[in-house]
Amino acid sequence: MQNRKIDRRSFLALSGSALTASVLAGKISAAPMLNFGDVTPFTLMKLPYADSALTPVISSNTMGFHYGKHHKGYVDKLNELIKDTPFAAMSLEAIVKQTSGDKTKTPIYNNAAQVWNHNFYWNSLKPGGGGKPGGKLAQKIDEAFGDLDKFKKQFSDTAVSQFGTGWGWLVADAGGKLKIVKTGDADAPYLDGLKPLLTIDVWEHAYYLDYQNRRADYVNAVIDKLLNWDFAAENLAK
């Protein structure tokens, strides 16, 4: 987790600060794999579909709370925490990487990471999704897991087994091999050098209104009916 990244506007804002020293020392790395907002204050991302479009897997009621309250709450709190600080000039991913592991910056890290993760989650879903991937992604899945059914089972088992709050992820390692991992709380696999392709949110607020304690039913429904394979393929190609 030693790599750090900063956007070009940060050099001006960080002049004379400790963060500037980090930049000049080369501790902040190259451009982000995914860029979810370079301009602050950050805003709640626009969903790529109507808030009713994921029914019946995810209800409008859940979307209202999850997207409209929880996700928005992370955005608002992040803006509050970074106002008038050097972080206000940084991209979202740069903030996450710069604050990861720094206990004095835990509130900033948690909110920034949750904004990033939720942005990624909404893009990991699409109405009428699921089904079968194609092209190179399908080949990679077969190579890594045997076949699509085995992938689905492993993805489900991994996400469902996450203790407490967290996320299930399909990722690619540095060699391009696909893996399934889980992270707790606000953590994300790109902090460990893995490229996220898809994610499933297994915080209770993602499913409890619709599924109560039946996390497995929620996860399996998302995998079968909502996964956005086009998004995964785009990420794999980056």
What are these regions (language model features)?
Residues D38, A53, K77, T199, ...:
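Histidine-anchored, small-residue-rich loop motif
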Residues N61-V75:
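Structured secondary-structure scaffolds
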Residues A53-V57, Q98-K103, G184-D187:
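Acidic/His metal-coordination segments adjacent to aromatic residues that form catalytic metal sites
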Residues M1-L19:
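N-terminal secretory signal peptides and thylakoid transit peptides that target proteins
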Residues A25-P56:
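C-terminal segment of N-terminal export signals and the immediately downstream linker at the start
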Residues D157-N213, N220-L227:
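An amphipathic alpha-helical core segment
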Residues G37-P41, K69-K72, E80-A89, A94-I180:
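All-alpha RGS (Regulator of G-protein Signaling) helical domain and cognate RGS-like helical scaffolds
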